[in-house]
Amino acid sequence: MATSISLTRYLVEQQRAGGLIPAQLRLLLEVVARACKSISHAVSKGALGDVLGTAGSENVQGEVQKKLDIIANGVLIEANEWGGHLAAMASEEMDGIYLVPHRYPQGEYLLLFDPLDGSSNIDVNVSIGTIFSVLRKPDGERRVEETDFLQPGTRQVAAGYCIYGPQTMLALTVGAGVALFTLDREQGSFVLTQENLRIPEETREFAINMSNMRHWAAPVKRYIDECLQGRSGPRGKDFNMRWVASMVADMHRILSRGGVFLYPWDRREPHKPGKLRLLYEANPMGWLVEQAGGAASNGRQRILEIQPTHLHERVSVILGSKNEVERVALYHGAR
């Protein structure tokens, strides 16, 4: 029987292999993984742990917070603030950045996260997850500022997500492909179950909320309409639609077997370039997809090359199988 490889061993081996992961980053990723295990435990309790329902508050985006949103956010902060690996954190659930208190050692990294993506699905027991991204803080001894987080996705040094479903699984990249780990609940550790995930360039599946079709721009309408025409249309093949309304769940499926995920701009909020957050969702997922051989675009530009202008910036998102993403970009007139 093959020896199982734990997340810790995997990270140590990556550290040894040409210094892909500095020691401080390795330790940070282990702490993030432990926090995800705690969140998984809280999620699995459901009604028995009094963690379902709303918290009676809103986040900076004006969205009603679930109890588990707040619990997961607190778990990630408390787990990471004292280890000496971080200088500051930013979360979809917080207005501003969280500076590591002076009483703790200051590290060289910045951690960004969506503590519980897809939280609208919590009460109906659909897969949800945590998305995270790691950046280096700028050089110097000065205190970290919000502008230090406004780095394009190309500067990420690690990114991943943890999905809480029938199994708890962790997808991770440090710039050398995507590895997938499964939580062994008996051992209490994440175990490597797949390396070098690859998204096929061609697909017959798309993920989008079709109920919003009347609000989309013409290029997205054209793309979806051609997919729906199936074998008798210009694409010459039948497509299936999949939509979980949980980005982590939809993207996990696409990383596992291919597909394209679209969350486009729509006319209901024309002043906003999209719905999903660039720093907490689009950048980490975009890097994972690219590391698996896929593509990530907002329709006109590679997502990872977008220069953020504020902490909670939103973007239009097209992620997944390379040929489909490029087709949607072509319809938008992207070069």
UniProtKB/Swiss-Prot annotation:
Family matches, as InterPro entries: FBPase_C_dom, FBPase_class-1, FBPase_N, FBPtase, Fructose_bisphosphatase_AS
GO cellular component: cytosol
The encoding gene: fbp
Pathway: Carbohydrate biosynthesis; gluconeogenesis
Residue numbers binding Mg(2+) 1: 92, 114, 116
Record text on subunit structure and interactions: Homotetramer.
Disulfide-bond pairs as recorded: none
GO molecular function: fructose 1,6-bisphosphate 1-phosphatase activity; magnesium ion binding
EC numbers for this chain: 3.1.3.11
Gene3D superfamilies: 3.40.190.80, Fructose-1,6-Bisphosphatase, subunit A, domain 1
Cofactor binding, per record: Binds 2 magnesium ions per subunit.
Location in or out of the cell: Cytoplasm
Keyword Cytoplasm annotated: yes
Reactions that this protein is recorded to catalyse: beta-D-fructose 1,6-bisphosphate + H2O = beta-D-fructose 6-phosphate + phosphate
Gene Ontology biological-process annotations: fructose 1,6-bisphosphate metabolic process; fructose 6-phosphate metabolic process; fructose metabolic process; gluconeogenesis; sucrose biosynthetic process
KW Transferase (keyword) present: no
Protein name in UniProt: Fructose-1,6-bisphosphatase class 1
Family in the record: Belongs to the FBPase class 1 family.
Segments crossing the lipid bilayer: none
Cofactor: Mg(2+)
Binding site for substrate: 117-120, 209, 275
Binding site for Mg(2+) 2: 114, 117, 281
Keywords from the named record: Carbohydrate metabolism, Cytoplasm, Hydrolase, Magnesium, Metal-binding
